[in-house]
Amino acid sequence: MQTIFFGSIGTLVETSEIQRKAFNTAFKEFGLNWYWNIGNYINMIQKPGGIQRIKEYSKSKLKDNEVKKIYDLKIKYFREYSVNAVKPREGDLEVINYANINNIKLGFITTTSKETIDIIKDSLSRYIDFNNFDLITYEKDCSKKKPNPDIYNFAINNLNVAKNNSITIEDTPVSYASSKKANIKTILFPGEYSVNKNNISSSYKIFEEVKNFFEINQI
């Protein structure tokens, strides 16, 4: 059985600027004199984990319950700012349609919170029927986040599919490494805030890449 994995949420939709704005609004409401500009936010999001991002920025001066309150505020504003503000990235709908036509399984392999994924699903509901996805993962599904391969090994086992018949689309080098370490063919589909310091081969023509992969492997 063949499988297409969309990785981090940035493979489906550009939300980095909306999330940065949501973080800054949350900081202000919580009473913190913090402001994440585009430059430092780009560096922060090269690895996943919003709660960890807050902890590291505070230099562990905030208590866990305070970090959670800030993150909950961020989620609230992310939901608010996402309404009618996002659409799928170019090529995504073609890939999903190709999977449906050819009976290829679909996975959305994230290590983020269910609250965040629910916002993405709601925001893209005009374009994407997430019932077409055979598996959607969250942070609870692995003990170690990307670039550790745990979440992809979990997905492969859960769907009972072969790695050599699977392909992953990821948006940052860190998340790309997670899929590669699981020995899955991986395409780097950089987002607007993605930093590719190691010059990993990347592509914005993901439909062509996916189609070529399965044609070579004779679906």
Where are the regions that the model predicts?
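Alpha-helix N-cap/helix-start capping motif
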Residues: 16-17, 48, 93, 111-114, ...
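Short, Lys/Arg-enriched, disordered terminal segments
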Residues: 1-2, 101, 214-219
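A general structural motif
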Residues: 1, 103, 163-165
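Asp-based, Mg2+/Mn2+-dependent phosphohydrolase catalytic module
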Residues: 113-114, 119-219
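N-terminal helical cap/lid subdomain that shapes the substrate entry/recognition surface
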Residues: 2-93, 98-102
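Substrate-recognition element of Asp-dependent hydrolases with the DxDx(T/V) motif
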Residues: 23, 92-123, 179
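Conserved SAM-binding loop
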Residues: 12, 106-109, 168-169
